[in-house]
A protein has these predicted regions:
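PP2C/PPM-type serine/threonine phosphatase catalytic domain
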Residues: 2-257
Length: 257
């Protein structure tokens, strides 16, 4: 769904109250071959078998911001293994209110890279849950991190997200959010839509920006793809912590991409 005001579809987005550290990892997919016209009987692009990925551009940016400690971490699997294994890009944002946020973020990135390549993308949510359980047992809820993990195989994209970090897609000049932030605000909105209380109360609740899911939680729920998402020529992906997406407007993010 387009996330900028000039799109034909309008949706609301409530920004978090505080901006965290700035970290963005941009995956720019610049395919050199021209697009072919789709035949009338061609399968839906989301489920169609993806073709090869001729050209892939990568870039990353990390900043400390106003914090004294960098609690964000990111990593990319070896590009030399792109054709054999695909590519994994991981971003973690350590939870600033927890003592071990930075450490857990770094260890989570390392863990994901050590597990890749995995045999079955559908098994990744369970791998993440197992890791989160280990983190919980070690830190007893006193440390945590968000997670965005994107896997590219040819033109197929799989992803798993935990917490309030973002995965954006820029396509034909429009910005789309591919994941849903796991914040208390979204749970409140669903309850408000059921008639429990006004939607305005959900958006102004003092705990609206609190995370409902994070690595380090005992019983974790991931936001993951079940079917691969097919990328198109000139698509661009952005893995971003809330330090970027809560500081910049969606139009600024789109223009920067």
């Amino acid at each position: 769904r387009p996330l900028v005001p000039d799109s034909p579809i309008l949706i609301w987005m409530a920004l978090a109250l505080c901006a965290g550290l700035a970290l963005a990892l941009i995956l720019v997919l610049a395919l050199v071959r021209k697009r072919k016209k789709r035949a009338a009987h061609e399968k839906d692009p989301v489920t169609a078998k993806p073709g090869p990925l001729p050209v892939l551009g990568l870039a990353n940016l990390q900043g400390l911001g106003s914090r004294e400690e960098q609690q964000d971490a990111f990593g990319i699997s070896p590009v030399s293994r792109l054709e054999e294994d695909g590519l994994l890009a991981v971003l973690c944002d350590g939870m600033g209110g927890m003592a071990e946020g930075g450490r857990i973020a770094g260890e989570t990135v390392s863990k994901m890279l050590s597990l890749f390549p995995w045999k079955d993308d559908l098994a990744v949510p369970e791998l993440i849950r197992q890791w989160s359980s280990l983190v919980y047992k070690q830190f007893r809820g006193h440390g945590g991190t968000t997670l965005v993990a994107a896997v590219l195989r040819g033109q197929a994209l799989h992803f798993c997200c935990v917490g309030d970090s973002d995965l954006f897609l820029l396509r034909d000049g429009r910005l789309y959010s591919l994941n849903t932030r796991q914040e208390f605000k979204n749970d409140l909105v669903l309850r408000a839509l059921d008639g429990s209380f006004p939607v305005e109360e959900a958006l102004t609740d003092p705990q609206a920006g609190a995370l409902t899911e994070y690595i380090g939680k005992e019983d974790l729920r991931c936001d993951c793809t079940r079917l691969p998402f097919t990328l198109l020529p000139e698509d661009a992906l952005l893995l971003s912590s809330d330090g970027v997406s809560d500081t910049l407007t969606l139009k600024q993010i789109r223009d920067a991409m």
